[in-house]
Amino acid sequence: MQRIRIIDSHTGGEPTRLVIGGFPDLGQGDMAERRRLLGERHDAWRAACILEPRGSDVLVGALLCAPVDPEACAGVIFFNNSGYLGMCGHGTIGLVASLAHLGRIGPGVHRIETPVGEVEATLHEDGSVSVRNVPAYRYRRQVSVEVPGIGRVSGDIAWGGNWFFLVAGHGQRLAGDNLDALTAYTVAVQQALDDQDIRGEDGGAIDHIELFADDPHADSRNFVLCPGKAYDRSPCGTGTSAKLACLAADGKLLPGQPWRQASVIGSQFEGRYEWLDGQPGGPIVPTIRGRAHVSAEATLLLADDDPFAWGIRR
């Protein structure tokens, strides 16, 4: 029998499953190399942890790793039901909250290595977490895609740690009782982008679709379709970073000015940015602040005679 030790948390309603023991050894390379090894040689462990019957399509997994730099707090590899993520904002907040719950860190600034670079997380005295993300930028403005059954949809392509297609003029109602329609709409947009080979820089797959609308209690409300076709319950840390990059590029948000981003279920992140290297008009360095709550400590058991020990593959 195999055992996987986990800490579950949620950040604004979006769950994170932190793996703290039981996965195969991935060597001493950087997080990008370890992610490659996990995907190529040990992907069954991701599936066992995230897929049904032990997980769900809503879960984001976070494998806790020893960092390359001994001055860093931790390394982490993020994954979900469809594969691997470069960075995850809500997951980083969940990681920090879980490490604090375990007594491994206290309030202060902590460096975390990810497959797309190092981020800086601050655990505040009130329990909230700020994540100083990897640089974000808008790659292309108002790109149009013809979506079968919908028509022409225009949006910005931006990087916030993952690739996003950000749409404001969509005509959809962003509400918790309209999730099926929102999912169908964003899935169709994502499929059209893929079919028409519309991609991020260097051919990066656009695997997140983000819709925006007004919100009475925040600067904006969003609906984010994640890889694997689940929607983000949180306001999405990397998605908010991509949004800040677009606002900065359009001159609609000043450096240091707060931006309150609400999710489709009403949870909120606060975002701010500064220009990378102090150069206006280029990439930004976004900081996202939110809160996570630990919901479980558990050990997943993978019995030798369990036909679904390694997940239900569809």
Swiss-Prot record:
Changing residue 88 to S: Loss of catalytic activity. Inhibited by iodoacetate, iodoacetamide and by high amounts (10 mM) of pyrrole-2-carboxylate (PYC). Not inhibited by PYC at 1 mM. Disulfide bonds: none annotated. Induction: Is up-regulated when the bacterium is grown on t4LHyp or t3LHyp as sole carbon source. Gene3D superfamilies: Diaminopimelate Epimerase, Chain A, domain 1. Coiled coil: none annotated. Its EC number is 5.1.1.8. Belongs to the proline racemase family. This is 4-hydroxyproline 2-epimerase. It comes from Pseudomonas aeruginosa (strain ATCC 15692 / DSM 22644 / CIP 104116 / JCM 14847 / LMG 12228 / 1C / PRS 101 / PAO1).
